[in-house]
Amino acid sequence: MLYNSGIAWKKSPNKRVSLFGMSGVGKTFISNILRKSKEWFHYSVDYRIGTKYLGEEIIDTFKKEAMKVSLLREHLLNDSIYISSNISFQNLSPLSGFLGKPGDVDMGGIPFKQYLDRQRKHHSAEIGATIDTELFAHKAQDIYGYKHFISDTSGSLCEIVNPNNPNDLVLKALQQSYQLENLFFSCTIFLECEHVFFLREGNKL
């Protein structure tokens, strides 16, 4: 972290933070707390993946399943109904449902080859959505006037970067996101369960 004390952190007029850690550790939990303060812009990499990059794929998957049901098939073909994704920061089920689980189709699984194909698509989408952090860091200040920016990264960030490569495209993009203006201080926080407990007890960043 670039801050050597809580006082240094609090004195920063504009903060840019990237949270990273395994899925379920509390990145979105913390981001939601900050967003509700109305001073932080919350950028969710997973939400971006499930909307811009894989949104159409997700809906097409739902439609393909619906076409197996005669009643739904009839209504889809004559445009009587439509199917869409209701993905949100808090509900990423459409994305996880699309990725699926390899296994017996009769038990809700998908063929392993199809699973790998979807994982490859997600990998590419995750790279694109993470690189987009810089774009939204600009938007947060330039369009919406937010003082602070928090990037809620995906749980598999470590799988799309090479920390030993100084020219890694994703890491360079993240670095740029936090060096756009000299006004901004930045840091990256690795979350562990203790951090989430700290916030749940009513403490503030």
Regions found by a protein language model. Give the residues of each.
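Short beta-strand-centered segment that lines the nucleotide-binding/catalytic pocket of NTP-utilizing
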Residues: E39-L54
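Hydrophobic anchor at the beta1->P-loop junction of P-loop NTPases
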Residues: L19
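Hydrophobic positions on the alpha1 helix immediately C-terminal to the Walker A/P-loop
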Residues: I30, L34
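Conserved glycine(s) of the Walker
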Residues: G26
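The conserved Walker
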Residues: S23
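Pre-Walker A adenine-sensing motif
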Residues: M1-K11
